[in-house]
Amino acid sequence: MAKADKKKYSGATTNKQVAAEKHLTSVFKFNTDLGQHILKNPLVAQGIVDKAQIKPSDIVLEVGPGTGNLTVRILEQARKVVAVEMDPRMAAELTKRVHGTPAEKKLEIMLGDFMKTELPYFDICISNTPYQISSPLVFKLINQPRPPRVSILMFQREFAMRLLARPGDSLYCRLSANVQMWANVTHIMKVGRNNFRPPPQVESSVVRIEIKNPRPQIDFNEWDGLLRIVFVRKNRTISAGFKSTTVLEILEKNYKTFLAINNQSIDETENLQSLIKQKIETVLKETGLAEKRAGKCDQTDFLKLLYAFHQVGIHFS
């Protein structure tokens, strides 16, 4: 990917901002166990903010603001920034950084673990994401009652490529199929290790995630439950995934729940596990997916499978 155009961003990054960033990234001892790798390149930071296309009326959620190198740029464009930060030291430095400036009234800092924090309404999410919460963060955003219009997220390069992978790609996995059902994902830029302090061990990428509107009319837990089974070994046949004793026990339990909800009695003389196996075989045969591999299947294949299972009372959550 081409390097950021310095002329494009030079007007948005002041000498004062650059000096503040250099100071803050030089005095802190960062906790890499918390994924603290501060983005120090002002051109990359400005490029990320510009890609969010922030409106003056927008509320922006920032996850892991650190010392505020992205935050101060977001504050210039947004109505309000809600920053979720786990490290009290970082929160204190960010507070000091905006103290006495017009941006101070526009910043709200929520101190705590993002995954355990109840989020307020927001229009956009921007994050230099701590890599250990990459997947949980994506699914928390997707499952918001009112999901953001757009999310601009920095991830470990391989994780970003998994989000973008298509059927047949080596990196195509449950994450790929799951996220792409609910959102459109595009790659924005690569970010090298030397753009961070301290440098991480891996390269990074920035992606844009836009939640589909309207949302697909399927239950998230049902969809996710099916994918968890078929992607256990993505290069094995789909039928192989349904032969696991654990899977059969889960489906049997769910089937009993389905019957109870629909006021249908269980035939005590019938071997329920044999019935479940028979239903699975029938569905896989009729859909023509028994011998296909999950790593080669697309959304249409999985939707066909999910619908067929539901038709015979087999559920995944």
UniProtKB/Swiss-Prot annotation:
PANTHER family in UniProt: DIMETHYLADENOSINE TRANSFERASE, DIMETHYLADENOSINE TRANSFERASE-RELATED
Keyword Repeat: no
UniProt similarity note: Belongs to the class I-like SAM-binding methyltransferase superfamily. rRNA adenine N(6)-methyltransferase family.
Gene: DIM1
Single GO biological process annotation from the record: maturation of SSU-rRNA from tricistronic rRNA transcript (SSU-rRNA, 5.8S rRNA, LSU-rRNA)
GO molecular-function terms, A-Z: 18S rRNA (adenine(1779)-N(6)/adenine(1780)-N(6))-dimethyltransferase activity; RNA binding
Residues given in the record as S-adenosyl-L-methionine binding sites: 37, 39, 64, 85, 113, 128
Identification of the protein by name: Dimethyladenosine transferase
Catalytic function, reaction form: adenosine(1779)/adenosine(1780) in 18S rRNA + 4 S-adenosyl-L-methionine = N(6)-dimethyladenosine(1779)/N(6)-dimethyladenosine(1780) in 18S rRNA + 4 S-adenosyl-L-homocysteine + 4 H(+)
SMART domains membership: rADc (SM00650)
Keyword DNA repair attributed: no
Protein EC: 2.1.1.183
Taxonomic source organism: Candida glabrata (strain ATCC 2001 / BCRC 20586 / JCM 3761 / NBRC 0622 / NRRL Y-65 / CBS 138)
